[in-house]
Amino acid sequence: DTTDWEKFEKWAETVPYTFRNPLYHWTHLELKTAFGINKILNPQTAREIYDECNEKLSQPEYSARGMMRRYHVEVVCTTDDPIDSLEYHIKTRESGFEIKMLPTWRPDKAMAVEVPADFRSYVEKLAEVSGVTISNFDDMIAALRKRHDFFAEQGCRLSDHGIEEFYAEDYTDAEIKAIFNKVYGGTELTKEEILKFKSAMLVIFGEKIGRASCRER
């Protein structure tokens, strides 16, 4: 619960220690290209740079839309969960804004079966937003397919997956359905079951959901 200035001040204290790290160069590249500031950020210059940036950010040309126009951005793709409403994508399009803002499909939480309570909570939200009653694995896939179709209608053509390790376990449909029932019922899965479920979901996203939606368009 700190102020914006306090956060910026701490970053200014940290920047000198990032020398030879990309963070050092990125920080000063952004200050120079976006704000025209050539000063080195450190504790001594922090307040001056902070005030100058904020003064410029109050101007229309430094708004989010103004900055995108300056850099000739044509398309912005956001990272979105299947249960996201995409309401701001719709509002932006309806406002007549010339730069396209499109969603991307990021279904990590639909694969996150490590904590049964969290997974069940997510599936319940998925059921609510999709209008599909979910009581088994096939129901969940139907709900995800419905959401994927909605994303496609809003211009989504890209998928983004946060894969922290490689997995391509062999599995059967019966195993995956049983694993879903187990975790949805509140029982923790084994490491092998987790990997099998994630492997199955990647295949399903690529073959049964993504490819089908693209083919229909």
Regions found by a protein language model. Name each.
Residues 209-216:
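Residue-level detector of conserved catalytic or cofactor/ligand-binding positions
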Residues 1-207:
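Metal-cofactor-binding active-site regions of metalloenzymes
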